Amino acid sequence: QPASRLNQILDILQSEVIITSEKYLKDLEKLGFEGKVLMLSELNAVQEDPIILETIRNQAIDVDPLYGIFTSGSTGTPKGVVVGHRSVLDFIDCFTELFNITEKDVIGNQAPWDFDVSVKDIYSGLKTGATVQIIPKQLFSFPTKLIDFLIEREVTTLVWAVSALCIISTLNGFEYK
């Protein structure tokens, strides 16, 4: 993401805390964020407290936010969208039923996890017990390698952007095997 866009998002959020990893810490420092910075590795090392977790679970309701995502913004200004638990649960119930996704499936994830399309892959896997196989982005430049990968991983379900399917089709990837 360009620094200007990230700064716009930070201005909109007015966040007091950001969770990051070592990989992005220097980028965050360049943006001039003045709030508290928590390192993901440190949070992962904290021992879980079952009592606190139970208290939080008891307070949660289905309309609580599950995630927030920023759109590209047709005006050039990013717009934040907050999606609640109930919205995702209802959608995934219908989606997995419609496409008959079960614990026997292997879902080939093409969409980045910071893009809302990945919700179908992530939560279909969580709901049904299906395996979610992350497909390395570089394979989309080599259709035969991509097809080999899908066959080797026994991928049964693809929820892809049309552009990804078009690339494979244009390069005759579906006729490969």
Predicted ranges, named:
Residues 1-89, 97-100, 129:
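Carrier-protein-dependent adenylate-forming modules in NRPS/ANL systems
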Residues 3, 53, 89-92, 143, ...:
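Short, well-ordered alpha-helical scaffold segments within catalytic/effector domains
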Residues 3-6, 25-28, 118, 143, ...:
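Short, well-ordered alpha-helical microsegments
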Residues 22-26, 111-114, 138-139, 153-177:
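Adenylate-forming
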Residues 29, 93, 169:
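A short local structural element in Rossmann-fold oxidoreductases
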Residues 63, 69-72, 105, 111, ...:
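Active-site beta-alpha turn of Rossmann-fold NAD(P)-dependent dehydrogenases/reductases
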Residues 66, 120-123, 163:
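Active-site phosphate/pyrophosphate-handling residues
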Residues 79-108, 116-157:
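Conserved AMP-binding/adenylation subdomain of ANL enzymes
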